[in-house]
Amino acid sequence: METYMGHPRHVLICFVVFLSAGAWGLYWLPQRMLLDAGMTGGWGTVAQYVISLAVLLPIAIWRLLNGKQIGLRHWACGLLLGSGAVFYANSLLVTEVIRALVFFYLTPLWATLIETVFLKRRFGWSRVGTVALALAGVWIAIGTDVGIPVPIYLGDWFGLLAGFLIAAGAARTELEQPDGVFPLLFMVIVFGLIATIYQYPMLSSVIGEIPTLEIAVSSLPFLLGISLLFVLPTTAALFWSPSKIGTGVFGILILSELVVGVISAALLTDETFGWPQAVGATLIVVAGIAEVTSNSPRQQAPA
């Protein structure tokens, strides 16, 4: 009998999620670069989702004309995941990178709680151990810098809310089991764009008003590159995966983003990186490997 995590490409999917999330650990860098270039008020994030939607819209129209789904039945997944992704993206603009990461990376805890309460799934001590190990890694990596993780800045609250929304969206995706990547991706981008717009009033008072047309045009090549080569492919890989590997495994694997984020922030900003960050990052990686290997597909011999 096959276990729940019985997808034939379970380990490969986990590896792609781990790498994609790690790439998101560098996302703060282009976000800050856009802000420095004058794309204030979160308009750099808005532009990325406008470009992504412009790419996907012709495909959606073609699918409609050919009687195929464009994802309307998965609107709840799109609302949760798209809003969560944008809250995270904008959290990097209005707080320190390390603070945004710590509040976002309560995700494994949210994911396991959601699986337990809403999906009625029971876990053994292995899951308790991996979640505890991952959270311990988070605490060691950033606890010495931020102390008790209590939200103070707007970006702290954005990061906290982003983690919960993405965990909830992952659970919803696991329940709905979207047929194919495009329908879910299209809904995520649509609701992500909506989220960028309603967040603008909160961001304009902190990081400035709408940029000028000249600044927007000069930033367009950079925005096209981020949207087409980063936002679309990584969003597709990350948010499709919970339906194949489970919400809890997803929540732990995306901790690779924290590892990359902490190290890159230490190298490229004045934020510190010492033995706590090294030990914490190691614990997070170990937790991810343990979770994947303990849930990889295997066949039980007939009794």
Tell me what each language-model feature is.
Residues L12-S20, R63-F87, V131, L154-L161, ...:
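Loop-to-transmembrane-helix transition segments
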Residues F15, A47, L101-L106, T173-G192, ...:
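Helix-helix packing/entry segments at the starts of transmembrane helices
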Residues L56, S126-D145, P276-N295:
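Hydrophobic transmembrane alpha-helices of multi-pass small-molecule transport proteins
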Residues A60-R63, N90, T107-A132, V259-A278:
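C-terminal transmembrane-helix exit sites in multi-pass transporters
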